[in-house]
Amino acid sequence: MLKIYKTSTVEKKTKKVKKMTTDCWIDLIVPTTDEIDKVATRTGVDKNLILKLLDTDELPRVEQEDNATLIVIDIPYLEEKAEHKYKTYPLGIIITNNNYIITVSVKKTTMLNDFKRNIVKDFRTAKKTRFLIQILLKSASSYLKALKEVNNDIEAKEKVLKKSTENKDLV
């Protein structure tokens, strides 16, 4: 899925737009080959760079490419029905030299929704460094929320174990 956002300089509101223009944010969520080709052609980013970001095992890092900077972070998500509820997946952030910012993810993330809904204070698609820092802050907040939930789960299980007197309950 390809979505494009741009902050209006007059209204200072971020809106979904149809065309990729400078100072826009291109959000790719499990993109098709056609969407990757379209973004690569318009922005000048190597499509193999985007394709690499679709690997769920991609490691966090920062790389300087010919015409872009790549930042890969892991962001947490909750998978209720899995054995381990909390998992992470990579979010790729590409900041191009020709004023585009591209986010690439292998799953639909709620973490970026506040940017799309104009909830994040002082968010501007033209302010690439600020946007990056705001994404990192949102990611850190997501980890703190997940950590709090893990701690609550641990405390609840410790209470159950404390009340338990039979060995079968300990297994």
Feature annotation, model-predicted:
Residues 74-78, 85-171:
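Extended amphipathic alpha-helical scaffolding segments in membrane-proximal extra-membrane regions
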